[in-house]
Amino acid sequence: MFKKILFLLVLATTLFAQSDPASVRPDSAGIYYRMSIQAYSQQQYDRYLEYTQKILQVYPDNYTIQYNLASAYALNQDTINTIKILNSLVDKGLGLVAENDPDFESLQNIPAFKALVKKIERAKKPVKSSKKAFTVAEKDLFPRGIAYDPKTKNLYLSSLYKSKIVRIDRKGKIADFIPEKQDGLGPVIATRIDSDRRILWALSSYGAPNAKTPRDIAGTAYIYKYNLDDGTLIKKYDLLKPRGHFLTELVDDRVGNLYIADTGLRTIFRLDAQKDTLEKFINMRNYPQLTGLTISSDDKFLFVAHGNGILNIEIATGRITPLTHPEHILLVACDCLYFHNNSLIAIQTFLNRIVQFQLSPDFNSVTDYKILESNNSDFSVPSCGIIDGKYFYYVANSQINNLDRAGNILTPEQLKDILIFKAKL
């Protein structure tokens, strides 16, 4: 019972993080969610079902609430609807904890549930195409961003915890490129290299105030422009007012313009290469959790991963088109996004996998997908990557789940060497 309540609370965080708070009516999802928790804890399963159904009326596409609905049906002895929902979730790679969830204990001997368990076991089998490329012995680096210079073959890792950037040369030698907190560098969320212009871009953001983030800098963010050859700071762009910034991703086009995703203000900024000005490019107020950003090879379209899917933005007009997709293909929970040969490479951390989504000719829909890597025992919150020719390099174990909200390490003794994998595309 206690574990289930904790599970529901975790799901609540996911639910409301993916929703515009202004759209949640006080008499609908919020209240019904709290009532569903109370009903569950009091074993009033008929009410638990009733309230969960009402939440789903507001958020019909929320998979976590769909899972809750399956559990509510099971606790009310509705086997048919339980199995139907769980099968749909498992087909998408979700609901893989159902076999051990006590809410479904009464179904253990039912043939349909036994078949579902076998399907879950198949879904949990690893898909492996990656090889280890580099090992970084600095266990407490907590890398979030990775960048690549095709001219020197150097990789660059940015550190959330140590507020620095390290360089890995082609022989695997590792050294600090931008030392800890140099130039006022804070937690480094993402990096990008413009090899032709010899520039390394870095995003640094401060989140909510806590023991490590004083209120006077909370919600501020900075864009750093470094000389890629010697690490000297060329310029620092400040985003101070209004507060609430949190920069997550960046991508550049062929003429040097930089696009930056600000999930805090739900905005995409553009740093104009000719004018050297930072300006708001497009408002993303209807799209929470901007977690991935990439650009088409012809510089005509941006692709943005957000809490509920992936968007195509036509740069010339600002037209936003949510990517359509077959029902069995899941586009949510993409942390980092990369355009490659009319496809998108995505790290779906929540699903513990690296995937490649094939795009339609007009780039407005996903037609198919391929799992490049999944359920790897070395994974511990895989982080961002880079594409070098036919290979995708990525951080296999950022270990960000070992940091609390204030940025403190929870269990230092459990940290491992950082692994950089490469998967053939």
What does each of the following model-derived ranges do?
Residues 168-173, 227-232, 272-276, 314-319, ...:
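Short loop/turn segments that connect beta-strands within beta-propeller blades
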Residues 138-152, 182-198, 202-208, 240-258, ...:
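Beta-rich, blade/repeat-based domains predominating
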Residues 121, 125-166:
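Beta-strand-rich domains and repeat architectures in extracellular enzymes and scaffolds
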Residues 155-161, 201-217, 258-264, 302-308, ...:
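Conserved beta-strand positions in repeat-built beta-propeller and related beta-rich domains
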